[in-house]
Amino acid sequence: MQLFEYDRATHIMEAAGIDVIIATSQKSVAYLSDYWHPPSDQFYVLWDTEATHMTIVGLPAQCERDAFIVAGASESTTLEIMDPWIQDRRYWGPGYYIQTWDNPLDPNPPSGDVMEVTANALKEKGLANGTIAIEMRYLGSKYSGRLQELLPNATFVDAEDAIWALRMIKCDEEIRRFRIACEKGSKIWLDTIHSAEEGMTQSDLQAVYRRLCIENGAEYERAYMIFGPAGLDLSNGSPASGEVELEKGMFIRIDGQPKYQGYICNLSRIVGFGEVSDSLTKAHEIEKWLVERCMEEMKPGMKCSEIRQIELDLYDDIGYPPVIPYTGHGVGRVVHEPPYLSLNDHTVLQPNMVETLEPTICHSEGGDMFISIEDQFLITNDGIEWLTEAAPMDLYV
């Protein structure tokens, strides 16, 4: 279904002087169309290196020109079944299945030209001489160069700022998916914690988390499992999941990111396994207080940079310095999205934004351990809705 207000998209694009957005990254295509070919990633090779997976969405500033989608020919059945809101559907290439080729035994079939199909759509819609916004960060030069060759009179600009501006404000359907994702994510986290046993490795618990995602109807995006302190120096980063064995007196940190219908729950907790030291207990209390204090500032009208400054001021008397360069961040189809609660992001919080809070400290005793509690919130008209409240913030659960 359509996950944004077209009038708002028009306003954003016209303010930036954009006539049409050409989205090519997986997350932007999926956002604008609510469609992505399930088995495919951005670089999936179909039958040779000239035929890699590519799906494109064109979003004209004027809705009467009609949005369009360009997909590989072998996706036609999938598109019909998934039936996204975009009805102008075009296909490139002969498709993956040889029974559809002119000569099924051709050893060198034409791979097709996705940019030619895209350019033809733009010409038909009277946009060939307009300002075309492409995802410069993600669209390779081979593709972008081909599109510019086919449309020599067009002006090409970057689409990234316009797409992010559109994605920051969530629609009712996105919010519904977030609520379900966070409900599932909270349960998956708690069930994973209750599955922890002495002698387990981080990889063992990671496998439990993956399994629980499937059992609870969520997709596994990623999760960090960290046991510690474990004698590690984390001055420039946290350890990847590995073979540290869980012992009594350790913390378990799970930073989980399951998703539901494309939308992510970003939830992190630190819990004690067995009785932890007094200093670890105190660090947990401080971290919990930091999150709860920052929650008081999450409301429409607050600048992201103001919330970050308030967080930084809290460190003056707690005995720990800040660890990460922001207080929290936006979430959507990607776990880290604008706006960031950072000193250089002056975005004003608005209703229907989804943000996290994750002030983080580093406890050093027997090795470094990042102490992090992360929660996800919906900005409402008068405050916040705590989407991950079902996951206890307690030291022991």
Question: Which residues make up each language-model segment?
Answer:
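Active-site neighborhoods and metal-handling regions in enzymes and metal-associated proteins
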Residues: 1-397
